[in-house]
């Protein structure tokens, strides 16, 4: 089997998903109507609610949902074979993941841009709302803590990525000011700034920045120094108006990823490498069973509950008109899925273009690939870029830089979402300080830092990461449940939401229960307790939601 047929099949399905299935959802299920004002136009506070061109907003949404998830997850999951990973990434995206993101986005704009936690309260009561918001808050803190550590680790491992990763920030501020205040030609600016960013990647490859001497002079490890820098940046980035940094940075990053994806796929078409991984491998050494763990290992690229936080947290507050939700919510997810597909191609075929034994070396066991997944992606992707004439070492710098950029984008979007959640909790409990964006951002950063520092070396978030995959997908199931409740309330067809909702809740509840049992058997009472509490919260929210369905008439 070679890579080209897989690429062709996948993109035919993506095209069907966007041009046919998302159109059906938009017109027949949600009945999008551009005459209905969006929250961005109704509120338009110039800070969080800002009507935005759909392609710029797509850039923000795409880069915020992407992060490292669709890279690491598929890179690990192909240990069970390329076929299960391929089917879940492509079919899952078309019929579940894209539906989930689109549903969360539309449901939020129909509720004044409120988060899915607040929307749940309207249907299932205040108690369910508060518990769900607390669950969302805990997941956001975990994402921030883990991504801060992972980005810092990447900066240390790939010092060539430091310069281009930080160069994008001042450039994005200048870009945003030029577009929104000076009204400079958008296309000309885009070409100029992209050229500067790619030159920055070249400079990074020839002038890597090692912060070890500075860190040691401050009595810190390089990783801890970067963690402090990242959270300082996130504090300001999450508090500033979205047009100042968030939108232009994410638009520029999104274009960089789009260009990289195009080059990767051109390289794959030119080289058409042979897939050296087995189609199916049910018993890899040390791996958990493929069912249900495939569905939570690939936690992005096929489906991700974190996307509901982005859709209802930042993107819904910037949507200019309802019809834009198809491009932002659904097409944005197809973009992420295409990245996950590129990772599958890179790790199962690109990795072996110059060494047939490389795949077996990296995928010899579950523990081996869990510690080497990014190596597999960077090396395999660089080989594919080599097919279009890009030197392999420079290709590694490009890929490592973009992994860092998207992880950082996800992190500061997550801090902003955490600020929104804290603000909502402040309104519920009358804590007015939390409704101040700067105060809420400070609390968000401090709580995430507290988790980081709870374990030596900044690894505090990694302690809880084993439960994230299942918890993230449970959140996706609950977000679909909220979309179902909305459609039920307005008397619209619910089957396209109900079927994926039942599937996701069943699969991920089973995985969470198995994780809880395994942790109990290993004597890890902390992770067992966390898993058990999340399962109880899920059952309570589902129970309260269906009680609400029974007692609330449609209108």
Swiss-Prot record:
Nucleotide-binding found in the keyword field: no
GO CC annotation terms, alphabetical: plasma membrane
Gene Ontology terms describing biological process: cellular response to nutrient levels; cellular response to starvation; peptide transport; protein transport
Superkingdom field: Bacteria
Pfam families linked: CstA
Family annotation (InterPro entries): CstA (IPR051605), CstA_N (IPR003706)
Family that this chain belongs to: Belongs to the peptide transporter carbon starvation (CstA) (TC 2.A.114) family.
Name assigned to this protein: Peptide transporter CstA
Organism: Aquifex aeolicus (strain VF5)
Gene that produces this protein: cstA
């Amino acid at each position: 089997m070679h890579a080209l047929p897989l690429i062709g099949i996948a993109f035919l399905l993506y095209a069907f998903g966007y041009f046919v299935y998302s159109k059906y959802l938009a017109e027949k299920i949600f009945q999008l109507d551009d005459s209905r004002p969006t929250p961005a136009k109704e509120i338009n506070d110039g800070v969080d609610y800002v009507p935005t061109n759909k392609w710029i907003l797509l850039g923000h949404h795409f880069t915020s949902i992407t992060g490292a998830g669709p890279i690491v997850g598929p890179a690990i999951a192909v240990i069970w074979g390329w076929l299960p990973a391929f089917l879940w990434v492509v079919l899952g995206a078309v019929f579940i993941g894209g539906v989930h993101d689109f549903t969360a986005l539309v449901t939020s704009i129909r509720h004044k841009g409120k988060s899915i936690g607040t929307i749940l309260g309207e249907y299932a009561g205040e108690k369910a709302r508060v518990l769900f918001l607390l669950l969302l808050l805990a997941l956001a803190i975990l994402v921030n803590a883990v991504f801060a550590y992972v980005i810092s680790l990447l900066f240390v491992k790939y010092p060539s990525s430091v310069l281009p990763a930080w160069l994008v920030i001042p450039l994005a501020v200048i870009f945003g000011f030029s577009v929104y205040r000076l009204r400079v030609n958008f296309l000309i600016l885009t070409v100029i700034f992209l050229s500067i960013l790619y030159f920055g990647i070249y400079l990074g490859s020839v002038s890597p920045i090692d912060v070890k001497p500075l860190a040691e002079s401050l009595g810190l490890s390089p990783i801890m120094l970067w963690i402090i820098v990242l959270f300082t940046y996130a504090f300001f980035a999450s508090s500033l108006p979205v047009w100042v940094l968030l939108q232009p940075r994410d638009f520029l990053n999104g274009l960089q990823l789009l260009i990289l994806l195009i080059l990767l796929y051109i390289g794959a078409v030119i080289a058409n490498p042979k897939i050296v991984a087995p189609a199916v491998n049910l018993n890899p050494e040390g791996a958990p069973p493929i069912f249900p763990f495939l569905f939570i290992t690939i936690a992005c690229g096929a489906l991700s509950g974190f996307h509901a936080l982005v859709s209802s947290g930042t993107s819904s507050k910037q949507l200019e008109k309802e019809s834009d939700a198809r491009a932002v919510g659904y097409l944005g997810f197809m973009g992420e899925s295409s990245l996950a597909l590129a990772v599958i191609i890179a790790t199962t075929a690109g990795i072996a273009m110059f060494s047939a034994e490389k795949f077996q070396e990296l995928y010899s066991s579950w523990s081996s690939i869990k510690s080497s997944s990014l190596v597999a992606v960077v090396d395999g992707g660089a080989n594919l870029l080599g097919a279009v004439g890009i030197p392999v070492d420079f290709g590694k710098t490009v890929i490592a830089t973009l992994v860092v950029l998207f992880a950082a984008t996800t992190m500061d979007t997550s801090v902003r979402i955490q600020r929104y959640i804290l603000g909502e909790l402040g309104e519920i409990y009358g804590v007015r300080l939390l409704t101040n964006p700067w105060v809420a951002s400070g609390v968000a950063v401090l709580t995430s830092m507290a988790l980081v520092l709870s374990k030596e070396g900044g690894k505090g978030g990694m302690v809880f990461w084993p439960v994230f995959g299942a918890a993230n997908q449970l959140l996706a199931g609950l977000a679909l449940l909220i979309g179902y409740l909305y459609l039920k309330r307005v008397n619209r067809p619910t089957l396209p939401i109900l079927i994926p909702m039942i599937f996701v809740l069943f699969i991920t509840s089973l995985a969470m229960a198995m994780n809880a049992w395994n942790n109990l058997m290993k004597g890890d009472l902390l992770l067992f307790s966390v898993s058990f509490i999340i399962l109880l919260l899920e059952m309570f929210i589902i129970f309260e939601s269906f009680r609400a369905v029974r007692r609330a008439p449609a209108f």
